[in-house]
Amino acid sequence: MHRIVYLERDSIIAEVRRPDFPHHWAEHAKTLQSEVKERLAGATIAIVNKLQIDAELIAALPALQMVAVAATGANNIDLEACRVRGIVVSNIRGYASHTVPEHVLAMLLALSRNIFAYRQAVADGSWQRAEQFCFFDYPIRDLHGATLALIGSGNLGSGVARLAGAFGMHVLRSERKDALSVRPGYTLFAEALRQADAVSLHCPLSAETSKLIGESELRSMKPSALLINTARGGLVDETALARALQEGWIAGAGFDVLSVEPPRDGNPLLAPELLALPNFMLTPHIAWASQPAMQALADQLISNLEAFARGEPQHVLT
């Protein structure tokens, strides 16, 4: 009988049905990293979201057969160590194909039309003091006709492309940063950044993509460009982004992720002066979290467990 331990149950707000095979189920609302080893002792299946499962931990868990990641990103799992041990690692795919693209477009619309600046102008009485029916203190740009560069063209990037196309945007699919050749339908990374009125990140975080967007990339973008990140905080040099926003290298940014989550003191993107800027949006990693998306995630999570128990594992990363 499988022993299943769910370490971060509170990370999704959805009904999680029990698998259809014989098992013992234990779940914890939250788990500290220091508690993982003890709680997974004897487990054959671990369900995790953001907790680290590294080689040292894997070596201490001889019964472990499967790590079910309740998310798409699995940069918190030592996949090679799991592969060597024969541990199956599965992730969730396709569940956020509507909710994340909608969040991206919401950020693009709010920033391109300076919604927050104009809302504040009403709140502080600027409109009420105006001498005509409206005022134009902040530029308003249409998405129609603008160029959007996508870095990452998988399920989520393609979803953003579909919505952007409906708004009349011209979509560029960026080639990998260090690619020696360009695939048909793609644009050189550096050229995509230079042409873009907005850049949206949808690639996984890895050693190759860490700080993919740094000072040189930000300076190469148009001063009127926007940067959107709903993928992973580590894709961007956060110190460089803070400078870019304060010094006007780019026009604005919308982020749903930070390099360390939950964020702690010291992250440059949490500086009060930055959060006060009307051209910077920061949301608490909720682009994926519409109710339908979370339920789809929960359903697929259990489906992954059942497929593994049948000897037909799906969505395998190892």
Model segments located where?
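Phosphate-binding beta-alpha-beta segment of Rossmann-like dinucleotide-binding domains, i.e.
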Residues: 93-147
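An anion/phosphate-binding loop that grips the pyrophosphate of nucleotide cofactors and donors
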Residues: 43, 61, 195-196
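Rossmann-fold NAD(P) dinucleotide-binding segment
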Residues: 52-64, 79-81, 208-227
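Short beta->alpha connector loops at strand-helix junctions that form conserved
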Residues: 29, 70-71, 87-98, 175, ...
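Short glycine-/small-residue-rich Rossmann-like dinucleotide-binding loops
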Residues: 51, 72, 197, 203-205, ...
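N-terminal glycine-/charge-rich "phosphate-binding" loop or analogous flexible N-terminal tail
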Residues: 1-43, 172
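Rossmann-like dinucleotide-binding domain for NAD(H)/NADP(H)
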Residues: 224, 230-318
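Rossmann-like dinucleotide/phosphate-binding beta-alpha-beta segment
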Residues: 21, 134-223
